[in-house]
Amino acid sequence: MIVTGATNVKSTELSETARAKVNLTLRVVGRRADGFHDLESVVAFADCVDRLTLMPGTDLSLVAGGPRAQECGQAADNLVLKAARLLGERVANLTTGVFALDKHLPVAAGIGGGSADAAAALRLLARANGIAIGDPRLIEAARLTGADVPVCVCSEACVMTGVGETLQPLGLPAMPAVLVNPRVPVATKDVFAALGLRKGELHVGVSDVIEAIVWPKTGAPMNDWLAMLADGTNDLEPPAIRVQPVIGEVLARLRATGARLSRMSGSGATCFAIFGNEADARNAAQTIRLDRPQWWVHAGTLS
């Protein structure tokens, strides 16, 4: 059950933030025989968040509030409840309770909003039940909830491969950035359909695999990272623009700000731009807000 309304936090509740996920690069290696796509992605996390709290109890439910509460969908489709149920199938006598979601991140936006919420739910249930984050039962529940949920459980910069299950931590520095979403939802399945890979078809060569890349060490300057990231791409960007042409406009406006790097995240429609300093990021965000007040714009950091 999902109820929309106020989400008053009580002192006995547990709380977690759900950070937006940003794909700095995204290669589609190919489509497997089972229909899933193997991916290679450098993932960072932004400082824009949803907030999720848990009042531990016996009955599982979700109360949604915040400016995007109406976008949480039906209970059968909500990833917070799905993750909790999947963990409950694997952990006997799991304490669940009432989740309260303060929803701010856009949905169907390529920044893992629903996945980040589900990951926060798993972290809350782990705390409420004394389960380690690395517990195989929790990891399996995360994987079955959705491809982006395992990386969102960790919520730290990494290289993500496979169907999202293999994670390699990265020492990414904090990078000033702007995120822009034109408030147009994009269905991931539509973008992959537009990519058009057949089952068993490869999209990149063996020599392109991301595991072979030697990434900068922790503490390396941002310029070193930007040089590496600039060599990357998002393979879903062209098909996403075919599905929603406004994504091309978002990218054009970001690139016109003088950003160091601009790209689409995930399957869209959110795009990001990285800047040399926070002032430039704030100025770019303000310019875009004034020009396109209907768009969602966030200036902050990626790390």
Swiss-Prot record:
Gene3D superfamilies recorded: 3.30.230.10, GHMP kinase, C-terminal domain (3.30.70.890)
The UniProt record lists the keyword ATP-binding: yes
Active site per database record: 21, 148
Keyword Protein biosynthesis: no
Known pathway: Isoprenoid biosynthesis; isopentenyl diphosphate biosynthesis via DXP pathway; isopentenyl diphosphate from 1-deoxy-D-xylulose 5-phosphate: step 3/6
Enzyme class, spelled out: transferase
Pfam families: GHMP_kinases_C, GHMP_kinases_N
Catalytic activity: 4-CDP-2-C-methyl-D-erythritol + ATP = 4-CDP-2-C-methyl-D-erythritol 2-phosphate + ADP + H(+)
EC number(s) recorded for this UniProt protein: 2.7.1.148
Task of the protein: Catalyzes the phosphorylation of the position 2 hydroxy group of 4-diphosphocytidyl-2C-methyl-D-erythritol.
Protein's name according to its UniProt entry: 4-diphosphocytidyl-2-C-methyl-D-erythritol kinase
Natural source organism: Nitrobacter hamburgensis (strain DSM 10229 / NCIMB 13809 / X14)
